[in-house]
């Protein structure tokens, strides 16, 4: 019974270490800065939409309101 506990404790300890190393490796990959996060992608999409579409949309609305088309 005691050897079983030692074996389980050893497996738990080794598993904890390997999980910790995997997490560190994953964090190191994320620090590269090469991949954009979801939030950055959303911001860029919103910015592109504002810069490209809204001025045209406002021109169309003004054109229809004032019948200057």
Curated annotation (Swiss-Prot):
Kindly state which keywords UniProt assigns to this record, in alphabetical order: Amphibian defense peptide, Antibiotic, Antimicrobial, Cleavage on pair of basic residues, Cytolysis, Disulfide bond, Hemolysis, Secreted, Signal
Tissue spec. comment? Expressed by the skin glands.
A Gene Ontology biological process term? defense response to bacterium
Query: Where this protein primarily resides, as one coarse class?
Result: secreted
Compartments (UniProt record): Secreted
Identify the InterPro entries for this entry. EF_Hand_1_Ca_BS, Frog_antimicrobial_propeptide
Pfam families referenced in this protein's UniProt entry, alphabetically = FSAP_sig_propep (PF03032)
* Propiece span(s): 19-43
Q: Which residues form the signal peptide?
A: 1-18
S-S pairs: 63-69
Q: What does this protein do?
A: Antimicrobial peptide. Has activity against the Gram-positive bacterium S.aureus ATCC2592 (MIC=15 ug/ml), the Gram-negative bacteria E.coli ATCC25922 (MIC=60 ug/ml), B.dysenteriae (MIC=120 ug/ml), H.pylori NTCT11637 (MIC=30 ug/ml), and the fungus C.albicans ATCC2002 (MIC=30 ug/ml). Has little hemolytic activity on rabbit red blood cells.
Give the protein family.
Answer: Belongs to the frog skin active peptide (FSAP) family. Pleurain subfamily.
What this protein is called in its record is Pleurain-A1
Give the organism's phylogenetic lineage. Eukaryota, Metazoa, Chordata, Craniata, Vertebrata
